[in-house]
């Protein structure tokens, strides 16, 4: 699972940078200045972290221990974004966790866009989809929150996102793989209301690949209650196949966080999922698990956290209830 805490740090910096550009300027919309160094800004983060679970009894990581560098380009209404990860992946037992130990590189995002008065229209060789921005709005924990099984990072992403008053919206089309013969083609979008006290979003995604069709409906949001934040994600993932071997997954995730001090925040969440198989004679499967997390901010550049996930009911008597741990520390620049 890649909630990509490191990328969230970078994304926050890039969002802030884009937000500082006023589209209501006197320059004509399609008039651009010659390329200059002042049109570029760089942000990033250095991370150290990883996972452990009682099933594999291995220590492993394929994203958190990395240097992420993002370059932002702005020229009037023209936008550009490039994010590269320089990773140091590892696994103490590659037979159980198939992660090759050693350095790796990844272009996490690469897109060009145009800022209109109603939102940002972009084309990304690799980018997040629209729904990925909001499907986990109800997760207030650190890493092991649960949400709809929609597409996150995708390829050839055409996306439009914007906000009008309190209403937020987004839509995208994408492919799930850089190999078009192997990729699924998908479409998703969301509509939401954003207020100072609460945020709520409804989303939809559809993907098709040959004889398989998948539809996802999600509802997510959060609300501030005093100093605490409460969140909830609800979803239905419906997979239909021509051989009637599909399934419908109905799930929810409830979470809450509370700042014990200005630096320390504690959080917890509960996840429940019911899977209804289309295969004749196959019983429904009910799964549940709980996670607790702590997040500590040392200063405006250094933060860290730990998240512990415990299976409550795997829904399968042959599977043990396992424990999963994630811990990481990040320095942003």
Predicted regions and their residues:
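Outer-membrane beta-barrel proteins
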Residues: 2-333
């Amino acid at each position: 699972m890649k909630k990509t805490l490191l990328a969230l740090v970078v994304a926050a910096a890039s969002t802030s940078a884009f937000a500082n550009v006023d589209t209501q300027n006197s320059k004509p919309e399609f008039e651009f200045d010659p390329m200059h160094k002042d049109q570029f800004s760089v942000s990033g983060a250095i991370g150290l972290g990883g996972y452990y679970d009682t099933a594999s009894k291995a220590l492993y990581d394929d994203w958190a221990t990395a240097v992420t560098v993002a370059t932002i380009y702005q020229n009037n209404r023209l936008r550009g974004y490039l994010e590269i990860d320089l990773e140091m992946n590892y696994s103490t037992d590659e037979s159980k966790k198939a992660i090759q130990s050693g350095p790796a590189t990844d272009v996490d995002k690469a897109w060009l866009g145009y800022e209109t008065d109603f939102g940002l229209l972009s084309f990304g060789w690799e980018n997040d989809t629209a729904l990925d921005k909001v499907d986990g709005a109800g997760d207030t924990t650190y890493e092991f929150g649960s949400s709809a099984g929609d597409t996150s990072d995708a390829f050839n992403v055409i996306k439009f996102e914007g906000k009008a008053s309190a209403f937020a919206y987004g839509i995208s089309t994408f492919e799930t793989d850089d190999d078009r013969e192997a990729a699924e083609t998908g479409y998703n979008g969301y509509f939401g209301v954003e207020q100072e006290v609460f945020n709520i979003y409804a989303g939809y995604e559809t993907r098709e690949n040959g004889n398989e069709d998948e539809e996802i409906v999600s509802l997510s949001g959060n609300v501030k209650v005093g100093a605490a934040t409460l969140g909830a994600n609800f979803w239905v993932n419906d997979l239909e196949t021509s051989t009637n071997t599909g399934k419908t997954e109905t799930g929810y995730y409830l979470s809450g966080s509370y700042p014990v001090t200005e630096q320390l925040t504690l959080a917890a969440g509960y996840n429940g999922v019911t899977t209804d198989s289309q295969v004749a004679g196959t019983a429904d499967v009910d799964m549940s698990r709980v996670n607790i997390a702590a997040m500590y901010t040392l200063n405006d550049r250094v933060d860290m956290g730990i998240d512990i996930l415990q299976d409550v009911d795997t829904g399968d008597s042959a599977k043990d209830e396992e424990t999963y741990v994630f811990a990481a520390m990040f320095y942003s620049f």
